[in-house]
Swiss-Prot record:
Residues that, per the record, bind Mg(2+): D6, E55
Family: Belongs to the P-Pant transferase superfamily. AcpS family.
Function per UniProt: Transfers the 4'-phosphopantetheine moiety from coenzyme A to a Ser of acyl-carrier-protein.
InterPro entries: 4-PPantetheinyl_Trfase_dom, 4-PPantetheinyl_Trfase_dom_sf, ACPS, Ppantetheine-prot_Trfase_dom
Reaction equations catalysed: apo-[ACP] + CoA = holo-[ACP] + adenosine 3',5'-bisphosphate + H(+)
Gene Ontology MF terms: holo-[acyl-carrier-protein] synthase activity; magnesium ion binding
Name of the featured protein: Holo-[acyl-carrier-protein] synthase
Record HAMAP family: AcpS
UniProt cross-references to SUPFAM superfamilies, sorted A to Z: 4'-phosphopantetheinyl transferase
A single Gene Ontology CC term: cytoplasm
Top-level division of the source organism's lineage: Bacteria
């Protein structure tokens, strides 16, 4: 098991969204995530939460965004009860990630996310 955490200022997300619009969102959110976020009373809080969750996931993996891991490698949608659920969309990652969980929270100023990820053992490792 590996863990990662990230915190994002909502104002930073609002400024980028106001400046670049959908082009900004399309860089790191899937179409489903964009629909979810834009339906919210404060879309910037949900956008920041998804951004923080994806950062936390790649920190837990120890890879950062590069190579096989892209922003859209993970899609975070909510279940019927509102719990965020991680869907692995990157085919290269589906063989590496056994399970991934996130928790997302925000207030008026920031969004925070924590990720717990279980990776498949690498051949030849202990």
């Amino acid at each position: 098991m590996e863990i990662g955490v990230d915190i994002v200022e909502l104002e930073r997300i609002r400024n980028a969204w106001n400046r670049y619009g959908l082009a900004f969102l399309n860089r790191f959110l899937t179409a489903g995530e964009i629909v979810y976020c834009l339906e919210k009373k404060d879309p910037a809080a949900s956008i920041a939460g998804r951004f923080a969750a994806k950062e936390a996931l790649v920190k837990a993996m120890g890879t950062g965004i590069s190579g096989k891991v892209r922003w859209q490698s993970f899609e975070i949608l909510n279940d019927a009860k509102g719990k965020p659920v991680v869907h692995i969309t990157g085919t290269d990652l589906s063989s590496l990630v056994r399970s991934a969980r996130v928790s997302i929270s925000h207030d008026r100023h920031s969004a925070i996310a924590m990720a717990i990820i279980s990776l498949e053992p690498v051949a030849g490792s202990r």
